[in-house]
Every structure is written in C-alpha cells, then in structure tokens.
C-alpha cells in the first residue's frame, strides 16, 4: 500500500509553450507520469538533465517558496523558477504532512537570512550565518527534520564533508522510518546508498528507475578509487 504524501505526478505538456526550453530537455520527452512509492526518492543525472527543474516544479506546485524554506516563506530575491510547475498535477495520498521544507544549496544563504528575519521570542533564530557553511547547512536540515514531514532537498551534499553526509544519511533514514517522505536531487554516492530508496535516473533520454550500482555517481567513484593511478595516467597524459 502506498502511504506517501505525494504518490506521483502527471504531466500536461500542452500547457508548455512549444518554444520553451523544457521541451528541449531529452529526459522530459514522452514522460506522462511518474509514481513515487518509497519514503525516499532520488533524482540523479548529468548537469542540465532536468532533475532539479522537476524537483522545483514539485515543490512549487505543492505550495513551497521557489527559493526554499517552508510553505510560510514568502520572500523572493530572484524569480527564476520554470513554468513546469504549471504543467504537472500532483497525486496526493490520504495522509497530509505535518511539516515540510524545500532546501536548495544554491539559495541557502537567502533562506538562512530569511530564517533570522522570521525569528521571534517563541521561535529564536538558529543563527546559521554564525556557523561555517557546512555546519549551518547541516544544522538547518537537521532542525527541520521531523517525523511525518515532507522534504525536498536539492544537492544537499554541496556544503557537506563525507562525514557530514553520513550524518545526514542517518537522519534521513530515521526520519523516513517515522513516516517522512523525501525527494532528493544528488550526485553523492554516499546519500544514494540510503536503503530502500527509489532512484530515478534522468540520463539517456528518459526518466527511469535504476539500481544504486547503475548510477554514474557510484560507477565513476568506484572506478576512480579502484583504479586511481591508471585513470590519472590516461586522463593527464600530455
């Protein structure tokens, strides 16, 4: 039984202008529906493959601020989100999330600033700007993780050391076990290792499920670790 908050999305491409760049993204060609059956869903693929665009569209269509934060964040520093949010319909489950957060590495500074502005006596600021980038990013993620919450993370590994990525992995796994749902765009072979997750790959002209060992993040990392000198000799030959 699927008991996720967001159980799938359907696409209505007639709502997108034929000249839109969205219709030139190969992974989107022909896709009509995606199902989300697991508490953790990853989007992986090469840069520009559409994974962050889809994550953003799901977030905006579900009521989150395009730049990140909770549904209560209404600030805007730069209106850059795509029109894909107008072309998707979210299939919701019978449960409703108790909390939610959209976390983007690229707009983290703005979200952290907004958090300070929203702070009051009952909800004091965590003062993220007084911490290192990695410490503040992890703290913001951890401070907002709750059971039965909905979370959309765009490349959370960008600010985190491998050890901190493992810390985040543990937090995500435990929270998912307690009824939370996650959508995560990542290149991290560490985060992708979370057990019992679905991985949607956006490469090779389609959006399709794949296994952990089939992801480029895993394959390239494994190849480099196991054949470092041979690869460097080939790549750096003059």
Predicted feature descriptions by range:
Residues 1-32, 37:
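N-terminal pre-Walker A segment at the start of P-loop NTPase domains
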Residues 42, 53-117:
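ABC ATPase nucleotide-binding domain signature region
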Residues 46-47:
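The conserved Walker
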Residues 50:
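Conserved glycine(s) of the Walker
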Residues 131-155, 163-175:
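GG-anchored amphipathic helix commonly corresponding to the ABC/SMC/Rad50 NBD signature/C-loop
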Residues 154, 184-185:
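Conserved D-loop beta-strand region of ABC ATPase nucleotide-binding domains
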Residues 163-181, 188-238:
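C-terminal lobe/lid and adjacent interdomain/linker elements of RecA-like ASCE P-loop ATPase modules
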């Amino acid at each position: 039984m699927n008991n996720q908050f967001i159980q799938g999305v359907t696409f209505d491409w007639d709502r997108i202008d034929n000249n839109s760049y969205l219709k030139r993204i190969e992974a989107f060609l022909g896709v009509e529906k995606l199902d989300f059956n697991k508490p953790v869903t990853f989007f992986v693929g090469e840069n520009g493959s559409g994974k962050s665009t889809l994550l953003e569209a799901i977030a905006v269509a579900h009521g989150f601020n395009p730049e990140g934060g909770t549904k209560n964040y209404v600030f805007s520093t730069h209106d850059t989100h795509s029109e894909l949010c107008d072309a998707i319909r979210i299939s919701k489950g019978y449960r409703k999330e108790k909390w939610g957060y959209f976390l983007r590495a690229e707009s983290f500074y703005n979200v952290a600033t907004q958090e300070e502005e929203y702070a009051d006596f009952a909800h004091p600021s965590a003062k993220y700007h007084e911490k290192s980038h990695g410490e503040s990013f992890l703290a913001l993620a951890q401070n907002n993780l709750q059971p039965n919450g909905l979370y959309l993370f765009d490349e959370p590994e960008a600010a985190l050391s491998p050890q901190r990525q493992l810390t985040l992995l543990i937090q995500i796994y435990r929270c998912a076990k307690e009824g939370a749902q996650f959508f995560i765009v990542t290149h991290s072979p560490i985060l992708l290792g979370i057990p019992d997750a679905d991985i949607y790959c956006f490469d090779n002209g389609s959006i399709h499920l794949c296994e952990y060992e089939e992801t480029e993040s895993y394959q390239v990392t494994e190849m480099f670790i196991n054949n470092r000198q041979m690869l460097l000799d080939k790549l750096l030959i003059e």
